[in-house]
A protein has these predicted regions:
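General structural signal for alpha-helix termini and helix-helix connectors
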Residues: 85, 89, 165-168, 181
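Surface-exposed acidic, glycine-flexible loop patches that form ligand/cofactor-binding
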Residues: 31-35, 166-173
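Juxtacatalytic substrate-recognition/specificity segment
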Residues: 1-82, 86-97, 105, 109, ...
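Acidic/His/Gly-enriched intrinsically disordered linker/tail segments
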Residues: 93-95, 99-161, 165, 169-170
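Short, compositionally biased low-complexity segments
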Residues: 1-4, 136, 169-177
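Acidic/polar loop patches that form or flank catalytic/metal-binding clefts of enzymes
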Residues: 35-41, 90-92, 113-122, 173-178
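Alpha-helical packing segments of well-folded alpha/beta enzyme cores
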Residues: 21-26, 79, 159-162, 166, ...
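Short alpha-helical scaffolding segments that buttress acidic/His motifs in well-ordered protein cores
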Residues: 105, 178-182
């Protein structure tokens, strides 16, 4: 597996931090879900403040990648999109389930491993409670991409909770076996 960091300006220390971190997350998720689906991974810095997971790379903003907490929050989320969203592609006509599953296995799971899973789920339920109401709620099958706090609460938080309920119902072993087969 070839790893790259394409930065707007040469910053060896920053590049090294991202390259070391991505190796650990790709190893972790490969053990959890199956082999990494591409021959390379690249962090690509851009001037817009984005965080997009693309097939075999992630496009992240120049200010964003310099926040130290990003290495263990948004970055693993974008790495995981190589499995969900850019490895197994959702049929957007049926709903973009990949954001909820990626949030569940990156944002949530990494905190759960530190004993903070329930706290994270509560925080996500509060987002749903605060931003979604009868007028702006919609079924998960209608979620494409986030374009508001309400759509984020539905497509990420609500769907994350669906995956948590599924895992709770079938158990860890069956849940992970199913993801590996998928």
């Amino acid at each position: 597996l070839s790893l790259y960091a394409f930065l707007l300006e040469e910053e060896d220390e920053l590049a090294d931090r991202y390259l070391q971190t991505v190796k650990g997350y790709i190893d972790f998720y490969s053990r959890l879900l199956g082999p990494y689906p591409y021959e390379k991974f690249a962090l690509v810095e851009n001037s817009r403040q984005t965080g997009y997971g693309m097939p075999s790379f992630t496009l992240m903003g120049s200010r964003i990648i310099r926040f130290p907490f990003i290495l263990h929050s948004s970055y693993p989320h974008e790495i995981l999109h190589n499995w969900w969203g850019n490895g197994v592609f959702p049929d957007l006509g049926q709903g973009n389930w990949s954001e909820g599953l990626t949030a569940y296995l990156a944002d949530h799971l990494l905190l759960e491993l530190k004993g903070k899973g329930a706290q994270y789920r509560f925080q996500e339920m509060m987002k749903f409670s605060n931003y979604v109401n009868k007028e702006n709620d919609f079924p998960l099958s209608a979620f494409g991409y986030r374009d508001s706090m309400a759509s984020q609460a539905i497509g990420y938080a609500k769907l994350l909770m669906v995956f948590h309920m599924l895992r709770t119902e079938v158990g860890d072993e069956n849940f992970l076996k199913s993801l590996k087969r998928f």
